[in-house]
A protein has these predicted regions:
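Substrate-binding surface in catalytic domains of secreted glycosidases
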Residues: 80-168
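Short acidic, S/G/P-rich loop/turn micro-motifs used as interaction or catalytic elements
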Residues: 12-15, 71-73, 122-124, 163, ...
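Conserved phosphate-coordination/catalytic loops
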Residues: 36-39, 131-138, 194-198
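Substrate-binding cleft of secreted/luminal carbohydrate-active enzymes
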Residues: 157, 161-163, 168-248
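Chitinase-like catalytic core of GlcNAc-active glycosidases
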Residues: 1-117
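Generic structural signal for well-ordered alpha-helices
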Residues: 42-53, 79-86, 137-145, 201-208, ...
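N-terminal substrate-binding region of glycoside hydrolase catalytic domains
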Residues: 7-11, 116, 121, 217-225
Length: 248
């Protein structure tokens, strides 16, 4: 059967606690007038997840996941939020997981049951000269060298997605998710960046070398129709079977 894990993305600005902002307010003028505590945010997010599960007839949810690009300056507030959310999720018989970006591996692990290691966004998307901004293990290897001693159970997520990136006079304008996201002017350049199967398998092998348990569960992001069609079934078998093949 299919298991659904609700995932909530939270922007890092929500946890910039020094300004006492309201993390979920959409009205910028209201952000300094009503401070919301990490406990209150945890309550609201869990209640919202439960409401959406019920409205969409999604039962037997065993895990919820938080995705946030937290930094050293927001760690305390973010970890406090996770602490409360983990307690509340446990009361509902659910685990709490969180995404772990490569640059976060050198920091204290978040207080969750397990982490999802995001094996992508390794390069600088804003540089036209960067040919592999999504996944290049030349950039990733320095981050994963201490995975064997990382104290949080991890699963790995590998990229299938691609980017269309708009540059103007050699300078980054933005990632084009739709044709009308940005005006395209004469002389602009649109470049497509996407990981090849050889890049993905190199990442899989690198993770195996550091800690094979991480690949006991493999996640591919994201599985829309176009991305799935990029590779054939034999390629996917290589990913999920963790096979090394010198020919790819």
């Amino acid at each position: 059967g299919m298991e659904i894990i609700p995932v909530v993305y939270i922007v890092n600005d929500c946890f910039k606690a020094k300004t006492k902002t309201n993390p979920i307010s959409s009205d910028k003028s209201d952000r300094k007038s009503s401070a919301e505590t990490p406990r209150q945010l945890a309550d609201k997010i869990l209640n919202r997840i439960l409401q959406m599960n019920e409205a969409n007839d999604i039962g037997n949810v065993k895990e919820i996941q938080i995705d946030c690009d937290w930094t050293a300056s927001t760690k305390d507030a973010y970890f406090e939020f996770l602490h409360f959310l983990k307690e509340k999720a446990k009361d509902k018989k659910m685990q709490l997981s969180a995404t772990i970006r490569l640059h976060q591996l050198s920091m204290t692990p978040p207080p969750v049951d397990r982490g999802i290691l995001m094996m992508y966004n390794t390069g600088d998307v804003k540089q036209l000269s960067c040919q592999k901004p999504i996944l290049d293990m030349k950039d990733g290897v320095p981050y994963i060298q201490h995975l064997g001693s990382y104290p949080l159970p991890l699963s790995a997520a590998y990229p299938l997605f691609s980017w269309r990136i708009l540059f103007r006079e050699g300078k980054f304008v933005g990632i084009m998710h739709a044709d009308d996201d940005f005006p395209v002017l004469p002389g602009d350049s649109i470049v497509v960046r996407k990981p090849e199967m050889s890049d993905i398998m190199e990442a899989v092998r690198s993770i195996n070398h550091q800690n094979g348990n991480i690949n006991s569960e493999v996640i591919l992001f994201d599985l829309n129709t176009d991305n799935i069609k990029r590779f054939n079934s034999e390629d996917y078998e290589k990913i999920f079977n963790h096979r090394s093949d010198s020919s790819i």
